[in-house]
Amino acid sequence: METNFDYLKKEKKFSSFANVAISAERIIIMDPEASIINSRRAMEFAIKWMYSVDSELEMPYRDNLHSLMNAEDYRQIIGVDLWKRMDYIRRCGNNVAHSSKKMGRDEAMLCLENLFIYLDYIAYCYSDVYEEHQFDPSIIYERIQKEKKSKEDSQAIKELLVKEQEKYAKQEVDLQKLIEENASLKQELSLRRKEQQPSYVPKPLDLSEYKTRKLYIDSMLTEAGWLEGKDWMNEVELSGMPNKSEVGIADYVLYDDMHRPLAVIEAKRTCVDVSKGRQQAKLYADILEQQYQRRPVIFLTNGFETHIIDGQYPERKCATIYSKRDLEKWFNLLSMKTSLKHITVDKKIAGRYYQEAAIKSVCQSFGEKNRRKALLVMATGSGKTRTVIALCDVLLKAGWVKNILFLADRNSLVTQAKRSFVNLLPSLSCTNLVEDKGNYTAHCVFSTYQTMMNCIDTISDEQGKLFTSGHFDLVICDEAHRSIYNKYKDIFNYFDAPLVGLTATPKDEIDKNTYEVFELENGVPTYGYDLAQAVKDGYLVDYVSVESKLKFIEQGIMYDDLSEEDKD
């Protein structure tokens, strides 16, 4: 049975993923969802293979698919367009596993095509001798036609494919073992990829076909928990448009349980078309607002790049379309929201003048200045955590936030922060994802960056994925600096929430790029309170230098003087 992936079998080094890819194509006629699962597995195995043979790819903290795909060095190597193709495969695989919506041949075929392009890239960069191949869907369509005409040996083939599927469903790739097996190839293949990659011509994302574009957008909606035909409607006819027919067709409208519109989605072919879609979507939103006395949120998307217009902040990019509960929460908060101009800070939590000033600066930034990022630079010991707890208290009472995410890079900082929140804001439900496994529904979530990266793609409930892009209304980043952002920027790009960064690094020593991350002028944080001022105010004491001599520096180390343990 010929497939598009047979060429991979010519090189033994591709064996860890070649057979799974072949199986994904062979089973597409009989079971499209099994084909999608195999496409996802083949992609995961191929990614792990790349990590095992390329010296520029460092193992992330976890070797699951989400972590491997989102590592910054990996994304830089494969490029944006190819990563987006791969993300479609990942998303469809998740939808098969977690969604009630059936995936069909169209989705499976697009997964196969995207997988083919990814594996062709691997062959181009790492093959001994590269031969150009094109994905040929006619091979599959001919097989479909043969199946329709003759069923003589179809039962035997089906039995063979079922056994094959069962075999690959149990197969796993041990990344550490793969690294050890491919150690001898690493230098040679890393060099080959560096030589080959510059001449690789990426296959452009073809979103001109409405059908193809819709598959990408539908997968995004399904992953967010929307149900087609129930709370997600396609091609909704709206009367009252300023055209000859006075009728317009909204590509998608998303509804709540009372069938009130939550969002309107305008799907366009390219990013260039977004401006056209923007005006059209605004007209649709105007009509729906007149009918339901509530203006829906607007999303503009081509399946890869998505923009949101919520009427509160300027139009911005967002990672995905919101889930139903994200949008329902957003409207509930909108109905409770009050101005941040005249706030009252709980002095039992943060009673010092500079803490109150910091909170008011952030509120002014979020409110009057209409910004979504703030950076607080406060000396160690001046009460950054108390300040941010009091800020959360203000924003909760003003109806600006419901769900809060507190991120830190060490378990100890996460534990300390949660303890302080519980003591000072006892009415706020809190959970530490590092320790409290299973308690995911608290309104204030504390986590390391690594743990949250893993939870985004793995935690779900009866309504679908839990940590969707609109789940949190405020993200707090402890010890915010450029290196943290670079390493985990996918978290900040994924969650569409206002961001508050905390750091004790003196404002004139903070990397210029950190200010750029928070969209601030270099050297000008949202609020700063330095050590010198804290000492002057009597809240902190200055450091004292103590001179001392070190034996190692003064006299060096003699091997004969070392203990037996140190000698080893």
Regions found by a protein language model. Name each.
Residues M1-Q165:
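Amphipathic alpha-helical interface elements
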Residues G104, G381, D478, T503:
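Conserved G/P- and acidic residue-centered "switch" motifs that form tight phosphate/ATP-binding loops
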Residues D120-N403, A408, S412-L428, Y440-C444, ...:
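ATP-dependent helicase/translocase motor core
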Residues N302-G303, S447-T451, E479, L502-P506:
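A short beta-strand-to-loop transition that corresponds to the Sensor-1 phosphate-sensing loop
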Residues L413, T451, E479-S483, D490, ...:
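Residues immediately C-terminal
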Residues C430-G438:
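Short acidic low-complexity segments
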Residues Q463-G501:
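SF2 helicase catalytic motif II
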Residues K512-D568:
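Interdomain helical connector at the RecA1-RecA2 junction of SF1/SF2 helicase-like NTPases
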